């Protein structure tokens, strides 16, 4: 099947074509790039929701409830669950999230797990492209759930239109909430497992941290929504908070929303240019295994990483 054929089937919303397309952008760099070229002009309509937070915060259950709520509103939904990579298979450890199987018979919901493949920011290299596939396939909402790796989750801002930071009482989140990186990426805070002891203290801690920030007229102040994802309590309120942020971004701060899209595009462009340069360097300039040899020299403290990088860049320019 050609990229054009597959693109046509993705645009028609065929589930098998969507699955094949996401596999392509994960595993076949050239074919994946050709596919994105074919569908890119038909993207930009879906609303991307990033859900992040520490391990054990109940993010998967929360996403499952979010899907149900959006479907109740008749929105079509795509989910990308970014999982840790298995060191043995290279695949996503948790697979296609058994906790979301209640939606498996719904053709208007597409759920896919993707492996981080060692990417420290928590997002798979191909997550952005997978979101484009779901966007092109006509999904109204695309939810990206990330692995919980703390402040490295700032990367989610570059992919999502709204970032939902999920916290849970009793996991040290009173301290975590004070960390600047988490504060900077949150558009909406969720205190999940809100029926647990300490939930109200956590809400107070987050409110106290928000109070330290100065918000100008028209600025968005992240709301704090308390949920119990296992029962669905608070999930409609969370969806309303997300929709309020979307309306605010569109009406009150369109320039800021556009700037966020530009930052996202620039990040992806830099990522592709950097990867392309490195691929060219390895293919055309370096001897087989030379990059690994240089890395070994850095690890052995025989050369510093800046000098090594400068030397390789100079050779690439020659």
What is each of the regions a protein language model found here?
Residues 93, 130, 155, 159, ...:
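Alpha-helical scaffold elements adjacent to nucleotide-binding pockets in ATP/GTP-utilizing enzyme cores
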Residues 226, 237-317:
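Long, well-ordered amphipathic alpha-helical subdomains in the mid-to-C-terminal portions
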Residues 156, 169-197:
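Flexible active-site lid/hinge loop adjacent to a nucleotide/diphosphate
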Residues 2-15, 51-55, 60, 214, ...:
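Expand to "…catalyze enediolate/carbanion chemistry for C-C bond making/breaking, isomerization
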Residues 2-49, 54-57, 62-152, 159-169, ...:
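Nucleotide-state-sensitive switch-loop elements of NTP-binding domains
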Residues 14, 83, 145, 192, ...:
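Residue-level signal for inorganic ion chemistry
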Residues 80, 166, 191-192, 227:
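Generic beta-sheet signal
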């Amino acid at each position: 099947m050609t990229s054009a054929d597959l693109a046509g089937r993705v645009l028609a919303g065929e589930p098998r074509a969507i699955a094949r397309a996401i596999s392509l952008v994960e595993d076949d760099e050239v074919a994946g790039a050709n596919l994105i070229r074919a569908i890119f002009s038909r993207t930009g309509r879906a609303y991307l929701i990033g859900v992040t937070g520490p391990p054990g915060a109940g993010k998967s259950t929360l996403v499952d409830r979010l899907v149900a709520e959006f479907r109740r509103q008749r929105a079509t939904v795509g989910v990308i669950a970014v999982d840790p990579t298995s060191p043995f298979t290279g695949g996503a450890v948790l697979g296609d999230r058994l906790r979301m199987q209640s939606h498996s018979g719904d053709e208007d919901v597409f759920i896919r797990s993707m492996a981080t493949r060692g990417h420290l920011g928590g997002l798979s290299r191909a997550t952005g492209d997978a979101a484009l596939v779901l966007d092109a396939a006509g999904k109204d909402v695309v939810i990206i759930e990330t692995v919980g790796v703390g402040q490295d989750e700032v990367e989610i801002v570059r992919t999502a239109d709204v970032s939902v930071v999920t916290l849970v009482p009793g996991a040290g989140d009173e301290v975590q909430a004070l960390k600047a990186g988490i504060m900077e990426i949150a558009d909406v805070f969720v205190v999940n497992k809100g029926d647990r002891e300490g939930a109200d203290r956590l809400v107070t801690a987050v409110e106290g941290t928000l109070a330290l920030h100065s918000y100008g007229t028209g600025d968005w102040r992240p709301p704090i929504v308390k949920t119990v994802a296992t029962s669905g309590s608070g999930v409609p309120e969370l969806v309303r908070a997300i929709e309020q942020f979307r309306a605010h971004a569109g009406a009150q701060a369109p320039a800021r929303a556009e700037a966020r899209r530009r930052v996202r595009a620039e990040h992806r462009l830099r990522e592709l240019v950097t990867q392309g340069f490195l691929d060219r360097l390895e293919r055309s300039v370096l001897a087989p295994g030379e990059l690994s040899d240089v890395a070994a020299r850095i690890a052995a403290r025989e050369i510093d990483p800046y000098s090594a990088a400068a030397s390789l860049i100079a050779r690439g320019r020659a």
